[in-house]
Regions:
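Charge-rich, well-structured scaffold segments of protease-associated domains
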Residues: 1-74, 150-276
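N- or domain-start disorder-to-order transition segments that initiate the globular core
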Residues: 77-110
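Intrinsically disordered, low-complexity segments enriched in polar/charged residues with Gly/Pro
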Residues: 2, 78-82, 90-91, 145-148, ...
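Solvent-exposed coil/turn segments that connect beta secondary-structure elements
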Residues: 41-44, 98-100, 106-108, 117-121, ...
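Preference for bulky hydrophobic residues occupying beta-strand positions
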Residues: 94, 114-116, 172
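Active/ligand-binding-proximal structured segments within catalytic/core domains
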Residues: 107-152
């Protein structure tokens, strides 16, 4: 938001100092004719009345308690105390072949989560988002996309790809006993995935359909489009999108190359699991 942390945490205290007249003065000064109005007209909402069926009243004895409920209510429960992360001591830092590693031990269970973080979001290149959406539908020379999911299911693991405004994240998680096998499977997939024209066509259709629906969605218009416009003006992360024509004309080789370029770039590895 472009403000110092010390200012941010004092925001509530500063707001408590304001009175009614301060609000009135602010509104009179800034809320004039410099506003935008959005009208949305989408047909006529015709509501058909449905006859309500007769409902048989149910007699409920709210005073009656089972033995199980009594035993449950009699148990003493300790208050839950929050546990805060100590960034100095809880998170460890190291390197794997010059790749920065951030790791934290999981004391709760025998599950792990491993994430590769690349500073290559849509602000760097908007094609990256489509490329990594495409990647999740692909297989390799030896397995199909469906077989990929079956293998992960047998390992008790999950694999996901996410591209935000700032970062690309490649993530795997699952049972610690299958950690090595899951990592090897991920590395093999990222080195040997192959294009699928049918999957690409379906992805294009899905993206264009979501765009069309978003134009009619009040939540998207207000909390995404308008908020971004208020923060950044005409050029914002929300408007940093590929045209429909570009999407229709993009080729598999373009997306495959984007994934490989990102995967070969500088990144950070983050691990959370039971291993030291």
């Amino acid at each position: 938001l472009g403000i110092e942390w010390s200012e941010y945490i004092q925001m509530i205290d500063e707001m408590s100092k304001l009175n009614k007249q301060d609000i009135i003065d602010f509104a009179n000064k800034y809320y004039k004719d410099n506003y935008a109005v959005v009208y949305k007209e989408q047909g006529e909402d015709i509501v058909e009345k449905v006859t309500k069926p007769n409902i048989t009243p149910v007699s409920v004895n709210r005073e009656s308690k089972t033995d199980f409920l009594n035993s449950l209510l009699s148990e003493e429960v300790n208050e839950i105390e929050p546990v805060f992360i100590d960034f100095e001591n809880d998170i460890n830092y190291g390197k794997i072949d010059e790749v920065p590693l951030h790791y934290m031990k999981n004391f709760e269970n025998q599950r792990f989560e491993l994430t590769y973080v690349f500073e290559a979001g849509t602000n760097v290149n908007p094609v990256n988002k489509i490329a990594f959406e495409y990647l999740q539908f692909l297989g390799t020379d030896s397995i199909t996309s469906k077989q990929k999911q079956e293998i992960l299911y047998k390992l008790g693991s999950e694999m996901s790809f996410n591209c935000s405004d700032d970062q690309v994240k490649i993530n795997i998680s699952g049972l610690d006993e299958n950690f090595e096998e899951t990592v090897k499977f991920l590395e093999n997939f990222l080195s040997n995935f192959k294009s699928d024209e049918e999957a690409l066509q379906k992805l294009k259709e899905d993206i264009l359909k979501k765009r069309s629906d978003a134009k009619l969605n009040k939540q998207t218009i207000l909390f995404n489009a308008m908020v971004n416009f208020a923060k950044y003006g005409e050029n914002s992360p929300f408007t940093n999108k590929l045209t429909n024509e570009f999407i229709n004309n993009i080729q598999s080789i373009d997306l495959v190359n984007k994934v490989r370029d990102v995967y070969a770039s500088k990144h950070v590895v983050k691990y959370y699991g039971p291993r030291d």
